[in-house]
Amino acid sequence: MTSSSKCLFFVFLCLAALLTPYLAEAEDRSKLIPIGPCSKIANCNQTCIESQFLGGKCIKWYPDSIKETCACLVKPSITHV
């Protein structure tokens, strides 16, 4: 009984160790604005720059997405206090 509970604990420990890096790699998308599918935008970064954004890149908006979306990086707002 003790060895089976140790084995089960070890399995959960391994799963946690495997999933933690994947979850840590999730990037902050709060500063990204999707503008369209990358297949229809020739140069995502240049298109975003021409649209007054800092730049852009093609990303999979959802982990299980097949298609990539062009997302532009929003300029930080500067507020004077």
Swiss-Prot record:
Instruction: Give the UniProt entry's GO cellular component terms.
Output: extracellular region
Report the InterPro entries cross-referenced here: Scorpion_toxin-like_sf
Q: Where in the cell is it found?
A: Secreted
Write out the GO biological process terms.
defense response to fungus; killing of cells of another organism
Swiss-Prot/TrEMBL keywords: Antimicrobial, Disulfide bond, Fungicide, Plant defense, Secreted, Signal
Protein name, per record: Putative defensin-like protein 31
Query: Would you indicate the residue range of the signal peptide?
Result: 1-26
Disulphide bonds annotated for this chain are C38-C58, C44-C70, C48-C72
Domain of life where this protein originates:
Eukaryota
The family line of this record is: Belongs to the DEFL family.
Q: What is its main location?
A: secreted
The answer to whether the entry has keyword Flavoprotein is no
